[in-house]
Amino acid sequence: MKRFFLLPLLLGAAACSSPQPETTTPAAPPAPPVVPGPDLTTLTDSNAAPLLRAYGQQYPAREVLLQTRHGNMRIRLYDDTPIHTANFLLLSRKGVFDETVFNRVVKGFAIQGGTSDHRSIRIREYRLPPEIRPQHFHKRGAVGMARYDSKVNPGKLSSNNDFYIVQGQQLTPAQAQAAAGRKLTPEQLQTYATLGGTPSLDGEYTVFGEVVEGLDVIDKIAAEPVGTDKWPKKDVDIKVKVLQ
């Protein structure tokens, strides 16, 4: 046992006999920049919509860059989904998405992100009123917001942070219309045939943007090996930067 204490004792003796260097108090780290916008811990189902509308009008932007180890996706956000767009911008600027991963990946369907087991930023679980527009459909690259199913959520209120990006599959016009919950336009049917998508989600979830660059990144993430819960076995981290 003595050998284990010998070196620390010698070091202690040397420290006592050596002059002590002058010590200085380390400077405090700079405070993080203050990001304008509503306090994420105070948003609720009842006040989120008006506060987010006001935020979007005061701090508008229409494009973000979503960065992953598989590459980047440039996403254009829609003007006519102002609540969802403002919410996505707010959480992006506050750094919420930078602490998240793609947590549910279903190849041939969609990749879902916005969740993390290690989030340090406090955020309340408020929901968003639906902004479902017939002109925004679930083509490949569509960006929508997840929600609980209609049995417990008949108002189709969206999650505040769980978003998804459509991969989908190419479908004939007949297949697309049969899968869709509403009447599709000829242009939408043609898009499902050439670009692909998941028409079964149309009319059920709010689509508030689309990938305009980096569609191939969707396929790379969708090809990740996943566990039984569809969570990729190797985390696909997310970083989101507001562009304009």
Walk through the language-model features, giving the residues of each.
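Cyclophilin-like peptidyl-prolyl cis-trans isomerases
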Residues: 16-244
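Sec-dependent bacterial lipoprotein signal peptides
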Residues: 1-14
